[in-house]
Amino acid sequence: MPPQIPNENDDLFTRWLKSRAIIQRAVSTRECFDSEVFLASGGWNITNEIITLKKYYQLKWPNSSCNSFHPKTVEFIKERLHNLEEHDSSWKIPNPAYSFKKAFLEDTKSAFSNLEPVWGPSRLLNPAELLLPQDEKLLVQEIPLEFAPFQYTNRFAYGGLQFKNNLFVTYGSYSFLAAGQCVEVHNFDILLNVSSLEICHALLPVIIPDDGDVRNFRNSSYVKFKDTQFNSIPELCSINFMKICNFMHQDFLLACGDNGIVYIWEINKVIKIFNKFTSDILGGKDNSRERYINVDPYMVLRVEESCWSVDVIDINGIIYIAVGHNKPGVTVFAFDKDVKKERRYIRPLDLPSSHNVPCVNFVPNSKDSVGYITLSYCSIFGNVVTVKLKEHDCTILTSFLDTQFFGDDLWTITPLTKKDFAKVDNFELLNLNYQDGFKESMLYSICRDDFLLGYYCDNAYLSGNFGIGTLLNQFQVPVTDLRLTSSAGIPDEVIPLRFTSFDRNYTTTGSIKYEYSREDFALILHAGDLDDMNDAVTKNTSCEQHLHQWTFWEDSGYKHYRATERGFSKYKDIINTFPQLITPSGRNKTSQYQNTSGRKICEPSTYKLTDLENDIEDISREFNRSIRNLKMDKQRQLRTSKEFKSLSSVNHIPNIESGNFLWYNTDAAADWRTLFGKDLNTVLKDPEICSLQLNSTEEDDVNSDPENEESGSSLTSFQRRYRDTEQRAHLKSESQKSWGFHNYVRNVKRLLESAVPGSEDSPLGYQLSEMHDEFFFLTTAHRLVLMKANPLIIISATHHEIFPLDGVVTCASKSLLQALNRINFVCHIKELNCIAVASQLGLISLLRLTEYRGIYSFRQEYILGWEVQDPVNPSPECRCNRNLFDAPMYGADGESSDTYCGVCDVYFPMGDICGLDYTYASDSEELKRKGYATLYVASRGSLRAFKITTEHGTTQQ
């Protein structure tokens, strides 16, 4: 009997599932990162009982026989792509720039691996210098600065090397740098024209109000307004983060302290006092060497624990301030915008987190039809959270949106809109992947999804974009393989070309021939002899042309599902026969944009994955035995664990103390269940999600192995360790990746359900009912991710580490370098559609946000701060990394030693970055100047500046 295939009666999600290598089955486990179960259990991924999910989604990676489209499908897709090209060529062919760009793309592909960054004969690191035409790439030039403005800042004077978030911001010609318990204020204009450093900057001390027993209220939050008298008492408080926000029609400087206090200054007031200070000194009116200026804060906020992030939004007459801290969680304060009215005391809100919150951001222009705004934050636990907020009757109401898990520390989240992306005319310019196999695979898969789900317009002259398939296919963004610069040789035998190919037959990898050692190959690579290098490579077989599905969660540690031979055979038949369904206009309703040919979907029979649904696996066996046998007393959790405490004591009416302080008792932590609105029992009763196996700890299939049994004391010890957030961080990656994929599939269903009815075949493209234009750009410790904002769906990501250190040879501590090498600095240069990402180690990558026919992605253009050295034949410019990250070493004469160690094959000149920000100079016809940005990088007591522009100036939105 021939296999059955999807038909018109299937809902869109079922069609999509059947077209993918994804299975739906039941699993039994104690560790669960299903988003709903996780929230309903109070933010614990370990449950008391074994939970059985009836619909657990897992990737079934097909073999080569599954990676092909039906010839009929290929015919339809080729016709669609041809029509789009014809649509473009009608106006692009007469354009000389278009012809030049087309020739450039063809020449680049014909060069094969010669233009691969690092690998090619030029050995250049930057993809933009090799793979982009002049009018498409950013132009970067370092501006030499003849001064070291941050001489006062000695990082070792404040406890040595410190791990902080961004400590440097710019405001016009002014800059602010956190220096211990002070904020260093500078004027760039004066710095460029005055030689004396002593009169170029001032220090703004961090102060706290000396009002009653402020320091004794450790379990309290407070707010103090500017109408209260402040006493300027310097307080030793290490600043963790600084930011500039606009609200109440003016700009403010915000600083987060290690003591849980957020200071908010009016920038204009700070600048006014600073200018008077510098004017008096420059004019000779003040000969004192006192560099302190005292500016009373406009507002002071306090949370219980150390705070590391803050953001503000001003909307609906209410100011919302969100503070991310190490309680862990997010505290949201709210105030009336109109200070002339009698101030209402709006109760603050605590939002939960399973680990520290290094970044929090409101989504601009996210107000919905009922007045809710959207807040986003990420956690070291490995997840991102979005939640809606609205002030009502002196209370902040919440509506939970989504959470997603990544299996890696998350450090930043940046809201974006479609206007932040630069349009490109060619697919290759989307993320600089010139491999024809990748292009064909992704475009075919997108077209297949559009046809299958009915999200396309038949008339190519009305719609130049692809449909919703652009959100259902994850783009792998290539980054330069910096490991190839290592003097010790490449880290393995496989040579994965990331941007180019060895030939035009879709080959993407090669391997070193057996007669060459890694060291021999390194000599060939660094000698620049291209012929010898290619002769040393064995080209691997071609990759498949279609359906090369890649996901963010796929790596060597991910265990794909292995179906039975019977199940796999049936699954393979579905993949091979399914494309017969794909003919244009796959909708039951009549479309006004339907192709005149009148082709419609055929009438296939129904198929159900019953065999795969009945294949149940207890994945709890994959986890640590102590985790599997963990027995928790839920009542004891409620009494002792922060994550399970009630919000009732948080939301009481505040007590108004002397000095106009607003005190809030925040002894109780926020609870995921309160935010989500459901408890675990409610979720377990949902037959679509899961069921509960009672007395599960006594089931034979769990405890049948006597070696799995643990003593009561061991369980108690494990439970105690597990409750510590640091221990939870080590446990999170065990299964977060597979559960992240499961949640991704569930969010695809939400995405399809959120489409506005009737927009599928509109010439204007599909429309989502909520947050249609919004995205998030996230950084993990080593990777970059672009997500749709709602639901949280990854659409582009880097698969490899952007700053890999595994091949680096250095005399400095490798473990220290790894700890510093987290991507926790992000600077969004909107005017140039550019994002700069950096690690404290001193490495920066300039990225470009791009869009092609409704596909939103990004590309890597430049790498800054990675200087390759040759320890065998060192040049006079070679430097050692030890003085950047360790205490300075001194020679016999007492001078700082800068002697090259003869070991470091990479030097990090911007080591120990403490912050980055930019200024922008607009186009000026009068000055005959194109718009440009200046990226400032503060590191190790020095300042570097990079001029960034494009050949045509500001990108037109």
Curated annotation (Swiss-Prot):
> Could you say which residues form the signal peptide?
none
* One annotated GO biological process: nonfunctional rRNA decay
According to the UniProt entry, which residues carry Phosphoserine?
704
Where in this protein does the record put region Disordered?
695-719
Q: Where is the composition biased (Acidic residues)?
A: 697-710
* KW Transcription regulation (keyword) present: yes
The organism's place on the tree of life at top rank: Eukaryota
Q: Looking at the Swiss-Prot or TrEMBL record, what is one Pfam family this protein matches? A: CRT10
- InterPro entries per UniProt: Crt10
UniProt keywords (A-Z) are: Phosphoprotein, Transcription, Transcription regulation
- Record's note on what induces expression: By DNA damage and hydroxyurea (HU).
Ribosomal protein: present as a keyword of the record? no
More about this protein: Present with 125 molecules/cell in log phase SD medium.
Give the quaternary structure: Component of a cullin-RING ligase (CRL) composed of 4 subunits: the RING protein HRT1, the cullin RTT101, a linker protein MMS1, and the substrate receptor CRT10. Interacts with MMS1.
Task performed by this protein: Substrate targeting component of a cullin-RING-based E3 ubiquitin-protein ligase complex RTT101(MMS1-CRT10). RTT101(MMS1-CRT10) may regulate nucleotide synthesis through transcriptional regulation of RNR genes encoding ribonucleotide reductases.
Annotated protein name in UniProt: Protein CRT10
Species of the source: Saccharomyces cerevisiae (strain ATCC 204508 / S288c) (Baker's yeast)
